[in-house]
């Protein structure tokens, strides 16, 4: 296996060199390493560091006693960065023999023998057998087969990545239903749909183990969904968490959408705005998907860590922090196309909505997305007025 040395943050590792003619080089290499996910890993360092500080302030525990597991480690880069840059004990697991040997080599390269260990186990077996303060599930594809074991294992925080955005967002409807026991809709807000479907799946799995959750930070970036969930032990916390579950009624004719809380609900089929037939998505998460104060703590951690993507991280976290807690976002260009109107700057639209007495914010999902409590009819009136 031919390798090269790369550096992320303050962590140096050896990674395989993929074949030069590979269509997707990361998956063609003997051990998976995707340089495009450095942004994800930079956010992970800052978010995990922020959560560790919370844990240290709330519990009688030492930093070196906090245990983190990366269930799908491949080269080990994610877990090594947590051990070296956050300073907690990290277990890096992978079923691949090549990955297992490479992780051990990379532990030595970084001198982290006292803070890190490599394991070669089936991820579900490892997570069902051992408990960790922080469980990180970042598989290639769907995390669905591992959520039960991860929910069982996590004491304090559960971090999950999903790269199967087509099933999550409704583009592959039946696959999404099978994997997440939820009906997603492929709408203009499909990225938020995918995030809320994933959060709903996590909430249900945690509830099975008498645990609730508080989403601290969630984002949809490029081809993946990522979330950081504080785990709240106890049946009462689980029951409270499930009260944030529900459905979304969406009218494809006029763009009306409405969240309906509860797992056993009655939803009128007729759209109250235009009389068209609504479509139903869910069950999914309808509560907040980030905590503003935690976002501020993550931003503060950026100053303590030399991250190559620091400014991109800051931009994403700031947008997440400032978003309204309203499902689901609107897309300015989609509405303008429907109306035959010219699109103004997104900030002008936000200001006009606020001037009309409504709440409004941009979102991190796309550059043309916004959230507001204004009815769809009012949104259209304001867009038409702005376009002249």
UniProtKB/Swiss-Prot annotation:
InterPro entries: SAM-dependent_MTases_sf, Trm1, TRM1_arc_bac, tRNA_met_Trm1_C. GO terms for molecular function: tRNA (guanine(26)-N2)-dimethyltransferase activity; tRNA binding. S-adenosyl-L-methionine binds at residues 41, 78, 94, 123. One of its GO terms (biological process) is tRNA N2-guanine methylation. Its EC number is 2.1.1.216. Keywords: Metal-binding, Methyltransferase, RNA-binding, S-adenosyl-L-methionine, Transferase, tRNA processing, tRNA-binding, Zinc. Zn(2+) binds at residues 251, 254, 271, 274. CDD domains: AdoMet_MTases (cd02440). Residues 4-383 form the Trm1 methyltransferase domain. It comes from the Archaea. It catalyses: guanosine(26) in tRNA + 2 S-adenosyl-L-methionine = N(2)-dimethylguanosine(26) in tRNA + 2 S-adenosyl-L-homocysteine + 2 H(+). Belongs to the class I-like SAM-binding methyltransferase superfamily. Trm1 family. PANTHER family: N 2 ,N 2 -DIMETHYLGUANOSINE TRNA METHYLTRANSFERASE (PTHR10631), TRNA (GUANINE(26)-N(2))-DIMETHYLTRANSFERASE (PTHR10631:SF3). Dimethylates a single guanine residue at position 26 of a number of tRNAs using S-adenosyl-L-methionine as donor of the methyl groups. NCBIfam families: TRM1 (TIGR00308). This is tRNA (guanine(26)-N(2))-dimethyltransferase. It comes from Methanosarcina mazei (strain ATCC BAA-159 / DSM 3647 / Goe1 / Go1 / JCM 11833 / OCM 88) (Methanosarcina frisia). The lineage of its organism: Archaea, Methanobacteriati, Methanobacteriota, Stenosarchaea group, Methanomicrobia.
């Amino acid at each position: 296996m031919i390798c090269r040395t790369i550096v992320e943050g303050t962590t140096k590792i050896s990674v395989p060199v993929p074949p030069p003619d590979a269509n997707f080089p990361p998956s063609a290499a003997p051990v998976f390493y995707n340089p495009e996910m450095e942004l994800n890993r930079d956010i992970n360092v800052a978010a995990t560091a922020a959560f560790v500080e919370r844990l240290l302030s709330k519990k009688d525990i030492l930093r070196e006693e906090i245990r983190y597991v990366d269930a799908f480690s491949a080269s080990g880069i994610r877990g090594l960065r947590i051990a070296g840059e956050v300073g907690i004990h990290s277990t890096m697991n992978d079923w691949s023999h090549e990955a297992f040997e490479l992780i051990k080599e990379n532990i030595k390269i970084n001198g982290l023998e006292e803070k890190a260990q490599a394991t070669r186990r089936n991820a579900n077996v490892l997570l069902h057998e051992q408990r960790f303060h922080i469980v990180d599930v970042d598989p290639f594809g769907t995390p669905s087969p591992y959520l039960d074991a991860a929910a069982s294992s996590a004491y304090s925080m559960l971090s999950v990545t999903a790269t199967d955005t087509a099933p999550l967002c409704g583009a592959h409807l039946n696959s999404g239903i099978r994997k997440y026991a939820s009906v997603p809709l492929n709408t203009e807000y499909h990225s938020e749909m995918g995030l809320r479907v994933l959060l709903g799946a996590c909430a249900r799995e945690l509830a099975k183990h008498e645990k609730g959750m508080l989403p601290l930070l969630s984002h949809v970036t490029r081809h993946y969904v990522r979330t950081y969930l504080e785990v709240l032990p106890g049946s009462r916390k689980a029951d409270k968490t499930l009260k944030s579950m529900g459905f979304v009624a969406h009218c494809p004719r006029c763009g009306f959408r409405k969240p309906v809380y509860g797992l056993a609900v009655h939803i009128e089929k007729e759209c109250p705005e235009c009389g068209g037939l609504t479509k139903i998505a869910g069950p999914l998460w309808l509560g907040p998907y980030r905590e503003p104060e935690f976002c501020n703590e993550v931003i503060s951690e950026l100053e303590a860590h030399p991250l190559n993507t620091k400014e991109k991280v800051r931009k994403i976290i700031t947008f997440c922090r400032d978003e309204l807690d309203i499902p689901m976002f609107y897309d300015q260009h989609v509405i303008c196309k429907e109306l035959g109107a010219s699109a103004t700057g997104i900030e002008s639209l936000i200001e006009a909505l606020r001037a009309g007495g409504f709440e409004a914010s941009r979102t991190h999902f796309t550059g043309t997305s916004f959230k507001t409590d204004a009815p769809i009819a009012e949104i259209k009136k304001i867009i038409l007025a702005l376009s002249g």
